[in-house]
């Protein structure tokens, strides 16, 4: 079945009953320690895929070379494996839609750019970074909406070079039409709308695609049927839907998840909150079972028992069995570490002595109390 056929077959009036096996993906960028949001999205992806006999794909979106951090891709593999969120396809395991790294797919994107340029749906922009900065500052000073002013649209390179603020390394921009569709049916948010976008860059001066082009092309070519992402991407959805329309391929269903927020209701940031780093939970001794349970509760209600009582402790398997998009909380919950500590304590107390000891060894080794493979005398000196 082709990518288009898979997408068309998976579209259904009932989002929780796809006609064909669904395909979902998580697509982190290797820009440092993996964000806890990667695990948050991945577990919802995986739950829906497993419930309906579909596939879960890991794609590495490494087109932002300025922010690329060596070794962070391996951290993605390691932390997702630690949580038990195993993918069916990805750079490390392969699959029918390889390659799964965007930097290895650069030849894939150019034909799509050429098509849009030839059809007049995109154009070259030679504006320098300084000229764009001045433009935005002027718009802000006049309290105007910020966005590209189309100075380059309809001009040849020679015509544009005669004007100030010229760069000989152009980008390619979408030509957003006046009648761009701004509404869609979201699996979580329901009927949703976003502001009109400006003429977004889809190909950078270095030849790398921007997120907006690459994500649409890759999701299409990998036959992704459901795109699960945070609500911060709602404003990008109209331009993505427009690209699907222009490229004449079916669009996937969108599910915009509630954001992970701190006590001040601000989005959790790795710059401000150590708990935004997925590796932090490993370092602090949280059990993966507890973290998955906690993340599920950030966007999904507890289990309601037959007697009406709520049960907040549940396994990933239980979460998968009862998963429905309609039950995802639109607003989300506060990222309360007290709740995680309580859950972690519960799961620790459920461990048998042998399992507890094996999980303690890495921490004891880090403190210099035992070797990486402790001997019986070393263990005998310990008192739990």
Write out the residue ranges for each language-model feature.
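Intrinsically disordered, low-complexity coil segments
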Residues: 13-20, 87-97, 158-165, 301-313, ...
């Amino acid at each position: 079945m082709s990518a288009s056929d898979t997408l068309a077959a998976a579209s259904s009036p009932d989002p929780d009953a796809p006609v064909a096996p669904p395909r979902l993906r998580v697509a982190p960028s290797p820009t440092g320690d993996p964000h806890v949001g990667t695990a948050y999205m991945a577990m919802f992806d995986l739950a829906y895929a497993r419930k309906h006999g579909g596939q879960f794909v890991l794609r590495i979106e490494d087109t932002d070379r300025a922010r690329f951090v060596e070794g962070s891709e391996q951290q993605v593999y390691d932390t997702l494996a630690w949580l038990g969120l195993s993918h069916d396809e990805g750079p490390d395991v392969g699959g029918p839609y390889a390659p799964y790294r965007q930097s290895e797919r650069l030849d894939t994107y150019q034909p799509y750019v050429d098509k849009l340029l030839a059809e007049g749906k995109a154009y070259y922009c030679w504006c320098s970074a300084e000229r764009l900065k001045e433009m935005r500052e002027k718009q802000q000073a006049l309290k105007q909406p910020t966005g590209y002013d189309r100075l380059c649209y309809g001009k040849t390179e020679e015509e544009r070079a005669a004007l100030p603020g010229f760069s000989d390394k152009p980008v390619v921009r979408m030509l957003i039409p006046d009648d761009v569709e701004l509404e869609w049916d979201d699996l979580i948010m329901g009927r949703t709308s976003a502001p009109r976008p400006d003429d977004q860059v889809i190909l950078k001066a270095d030849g790398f695609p921007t997120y907006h082009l690459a994500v649409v092309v890759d999701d299409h070519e990998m036959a992704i049927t459901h795109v699960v992402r945070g609500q911060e991407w709602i404003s990008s959805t109209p331009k993505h839907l427009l690209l699907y329309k222009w490229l004449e391929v079916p669009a996937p269903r969108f599910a915009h998840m509630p954001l992970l927020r701190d006590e001040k209701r601000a989005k959790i940031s790795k710059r401000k909150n150590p708990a935004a780093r997925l590796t932090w939970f490993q370092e602090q001794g949280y059990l993966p079972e507890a973290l998955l349970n906690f993340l599920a509760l950030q966007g999904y209600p507890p289990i309601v028992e037959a007697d009406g009582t709520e049960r907040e402790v549940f396994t990933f398997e239980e979460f998968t069995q009862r998963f429905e998009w309609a039950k995802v909380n639109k607003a989300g919950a506060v990222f309360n570490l007290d709740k995680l500590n309580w859950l972690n304590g519960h799961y620790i107390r459920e461990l048998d002595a042998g399992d507890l000891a094996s999980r303690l060894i890495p921490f004891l080794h880090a403190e210099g109390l035992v070797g990486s493979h402790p001997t019986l005398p070393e263990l005998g000196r310990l008192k739990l």
